[in-house]
Amino acid sequence: MGAEKITSKIVEDANKNAEKILAEALNEKEAILTEAKEEASKKEQAIAKKGEKDAEMTKNRILAEARLSAKKKLLEEREKTIQLTLEKLEEDLVKLPQKDEYKDTLLKLIISGVYSVGGGELELLLNKKDFEVIDDSTLWALEKEMEDRLKKVTVLKKGEAKSIIGGCIIKTADHTKVSDNSLEATFERNLDSVRAKIAEMLF
């Protein structure tokens, strides 16, 4: 499952919670404005003797402050919803290697990494469990596929096991080029676009 599909699924789940949170925020907004109108009305009456202009100014000031407070509350709830969705996305990211489709995702990340550094003699770094997923026959097939695509001899040598959730890190033999396609690095690189997508889908 690609990052976009994963994000879409999590956002879909989060949308239910978002609707509830936003409904509560809107109710609170209405309560703030209602209370402000009542307060403004009372103060307007209290200072009516001082003149209609002063009363109107006081009323407008109170209502403006209430609108600002309500808007701030909505923005806070919106940010909270986005943050909760991101946290859920990170939780699902940790679970991704347990899913049936993970091997396909891992292969795509490896291919992307090989493209990024330009092929040649490369070092493949995975976590311990993923080295079991990518056996020698799979590695050989990857090398052949990349040679055909890049028109360049490509050798993938297994390096040391890394403490990563999943995904891969590809290095050239001289370590001058590195492509970090670990799941966590990929998530961090796409964090801004993921936030924007969540906001677009939820709001």
Swiss-Prot record:
GO MF term list: ATP binding; proton-transporting ATP synthase activity, rotational mechanism; proton-transporting ATPase activity, rotational mechanism
GO CC terms: plasma membrane; proton-transporting two-sector ATPase complex, catalytic domain
Transmembrane segments annotated in the record for this chain: none
InterPro entries in the record: ATPase_E_C (IPR038495), ATPase_V1_Esu (IPR002842)
Cellular compartment(s): Cell membrane
Biological process, per Gene Ontology: proton motive force-driven plasma membrane ATP synthesis
Main location: membrane
Pfam family, one: vATP-synt_E
Recorded topology in the membrane: Peripheral membrane protein
Domain of life where this protein originates: Archaea
Subunit structure: Has multiple subunits with at least A(3), B(3), C, D, E, F, H, I and proteolipid K(x).
Function per UniProt: Component of the A-type ATP synthase that produces ATP from ADP in the presence of a proton gradient across the membrane.
Name of the protein described by the UniProt record: A-type ATP synthase subunit E
Species the sequence originates in: Methanococcus maripaludis (strain C6 / ATCC BAA-1332)
